[in-house]
Amino acid sequence: MQTVIFIGIFGALGCLCRYYLSGWVYDIVGRAFPYGTFAVNIIGAFLIGLIMEFSLRSTLVSPQLRVGLTIGFLGGLTTFSTFSYETFRLLEDGELLIASVNVLTSVLVCLVFTWLGIAAARYI
């Protein structure tokens, strides 16, 4: 039951962080490109690498907390569904280049940031 509570609490926090962080990014740089979604997914990619690598190498993070942070917080923070919808809308609007850049940069940059998170955890 503790795991479910962690998932719920951290999930709510992750959703709120996504809402405010992506909104803040859009306020700064505009909506010509899905920058807000891009930003939260990059942050989430780094954190999943960091949290998973650190928690699997250390006893400081309980399995319940790890699940709460990854499934809960990062599940609420990151969003594949919004990424998919925004990309689809770009395609529908005839913005093939922007949609392609979104897909390629999102996947590649998120993989790099996951690796950076893993590397950071190994350094700690």
Swiss-Prot record:
Superkingdom: Bacteria
Gene: fluC
Protein name: Fluoride-specific ion channel FluC
Molecular function terms, GO-annotated: fluoride channel activity; metal ion binding
Compartment(s) where it occurs, according to its Swiss-Prot or TrEMBL record: Cell inner membrane
Keyword set, alphabetical order: Cell inner membrane, Cell membrane, Ion channel, Ion transport, Membrane, Metal-binding, Sodium, Transmembrane, Transmembrane helix, Transport
Function: Fluoride-specific ion channel. Important for reducing fluoride concentration in the cell, thus reducing its toxicity.
Regulation of its activity: Na(+) is not transported, but it plays an essential structural role and its presence is essential for fluoride channel function.
Reaction equation(s) it catalyzes: fluoride(in) = fluoride(out)
Span of the signal peptide: none
Regions that span the bilayer: 4-24, 32-52, 68-88, 96-116
Coiled-coil portions: none
GO cellular component, one term: plasma membrane
NCBIfam families: crcB
Protein family per UniProt: Belongs to the fluoride channel Fluc/FEX (TC 1.A.43) family.
Cross-referenced Pfam families: CRCB (PF02537)
